[in-house]
Amino acid sequence: MSLILTINPGSTSTKIAVFAAEEELFERTVEHPHDAFSGLAGVYGQLEARRHAVQTMLSRAGYADARFDIVVGRGGLLAPMHGGAWRVNQTMLDILESAAHGEHPCNLGAPLALAFARSHGAHRNVQAIIVDPVVTDELDPVARIGGLPELPRRSVFHALSQRAAARRAAAQLGIRYEDGRFLVGHFGGGISVGAHRHGRVVDVNNALEGEGPFSPERTGGLPVMPALELVRRGVYSFERMRSIVQREGGMWAHLGTNDLREVQRRMDAGDTAAAQIFDALAYNSAKALCALLPALTGAGQDVPSAPPVDAVVLTGGMARSGRFMQAVSDRLRYLGPVIVLPRLEEMQALAMGGLRVLRGEETPAEYGGGMS
């Protein structure tokens, strides 16, 4: 029986799971407070702390001496590439460490996978791979065009989570994912919303670089001129503004917490500011999903006579909050069925990618550093 370790570093947590083929044996999450990594040099400075967290979780679950047949990490910010499995190699690690395509904790998925393939591999040639990285790029050509030729839109999103959730929703509806049309929202430290048309994610907000709704940690879209003015006047340096956009904006900037549970506790205690930000978060998320409706119909052809949405699918860590999901869903039900998948599908999606490799159904691609 193939033993698979999956590792998923995110903005606010590190998740691991162990699978015996398709069967999940154990899953654990360690939450990272907003100040857990203060004083460390960038995201890569968190590598040892997160490696120790993974080792601790394995040890406490009785897997300290386990030997894995493959280790699968969450993919990071690389050049645009097709979905599927990719082998972790030195070129990939160098680019992730340099943050050449952006800095985010998902950049640690590949080095963590390689570290545990080496320390806990069943043999010396155990592979470390990534699956469906966040830079999976399937955008329609028209979706790439923005308001400045020098700044074409990029596809950077929670590809693994979104596609796994959409596939699960399609199965619930009794249709093939490749035949359906879905609006999918991933709700975590960042929020990404995607239009899934016939098996491709043809438009999505780049949640890392300031598109879309604000989230627990990110600003989302900001008015450009006032933001530039803050930098010009020296209120914020460029580096400080980047940190705010990616890690210290949104709910954190308004309320001083990135924990939705804490916000709900404040609401229950009568905090009207918390209630207002909670409602704004739900409103902006629903608005972003609705904005993707044109992407589901294509360009002047294959236009459905009925509403184009087979389902709206909501997933991610915040989907565990029934209260928040209700606030989002109530604004979307006129579009069609709303399917909430509160249990994260990412770990299983990572494991299934590893299993396809072990079974010889898929050969990991070799990363060369350029657009693939």
Curated annotation (Swiss-Prot):
It comes from the Bacteria. It is an enzyme of class 2 (transferase). The keyword Kinase applies. One of its GO terms (biological process) is acetate metabolic process. One of its GO terms (molecular function) is ATP binding. Belongs to the acetokinase family. NCBIfam families: butyr_kinase, PRK03011.1-5. This is Probable butyrate kinase.
